[in-house]
Amino acid sequence: QDKCKKVYENYPVSKCQLANQCNYDCKLDKHARSGECFYDEKRNLQCICDYCEY
């Protein structure tokens, strides 16, 4: 069983529009495994940091 947590970060939309900016921020600033942008239920772009450990 792996320890897995995903943390929702509120990032400016501009960061999600730049290629992989969210991914870089999650890795460099948050020490996460990766990051990705997605639309929430209000159609706002969010950045989610993936802290899953394998």
Swiss-Prot record:
Disulfide feature: C4-C52, C16-C37, C22-C47, C26-C49
Source species, domain of life: Eukaryota
GO biological process, any: killing of cells of another organism
Transmembrane feature ranges: none
Cellular component, GO annotation: extracellular region
InterPro entries: Scorpion_toxin-like_sf
Residues carrying Pyrrolidone carboxylic acid: Q1
Family of this protein: Belongs to the DEFL family.
Subunit (UniProt): Monomer.
Protein name: Defensin-like protein
Species of origin: Pentadiplandra brazzeana
